[in-house]
Amino acid sequence: MTILGVDLGTTNSLAVVYKEGKPVLIPNAYGEYVTPSAVSILDGKIVVGKLAKERLITHPECSASLFKRNMGTDVTYALDKKEYDAATLSSFVVKQLIEDAQNYLHESIDEVVISVPAYFNARQRQDTKRIGELLGIKVERLINEPSAAAIACHMDDEYETFVVFDFGGGTLDVSVVDCFENVISINAISGNNHLGGTDFDRAMSEYFCFKNGLNYNVLDSSFQQSILRACEQAKIRLSTQSVVEVSLVCLLY
């Protein structure tokens, strides 16, 4: 029996299994280890990941992302005139990760472990567990994301304290974690469920529009997504470059 570990992220997700004493990352159909946490409806069928993220630009009316931010709430997303809650959309992402794992491993996946932010409340955790019910699989457990990070870093039996700084695409989480032997204890947590890399993308997009005489808030969804994508790529390039240029051909039409 193979248990799949799932890092269900706000903007990206990935899966891993433990084989022969070490973790093995699962590639998706594109050979990539990271799958965008995006969902879209194409010809009446659910598509997840890279294609869905692209369709946020071309078909925003039937695509969604960042839904993890609304786990444990009554917020729904209208995709192709049908309403989906955050847990249902998240289940589509997990289903895709399971299918990728089964294709890669040639094994059946019946159980998953899903990581969640340490600050998730009871309703948010229950919503995450509901993913298993929607897919007909067992959620063996939920593991706090800082605990998972500490386990990866804690290599011996000595007492250690870590500060886990998790600045993701959609959230910021900071935790103080104590480790001793096989015991992981989270002593303090703080964070912001609505601050992440996508918010930097949004700020850059608004500034780009301001500098070019545009009002970001009145642009249609496709325009906004095009600008967001260009600014996201610029942000990534700024990790290795001091200056980058953002240009959009679509603004000429």
PLM features per residue range, with description:
Residues 1-73, 77-83, 92, 99-252:
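Oxyanion-binding/catalytic loops of NTP- or PPi-dependent enzymes
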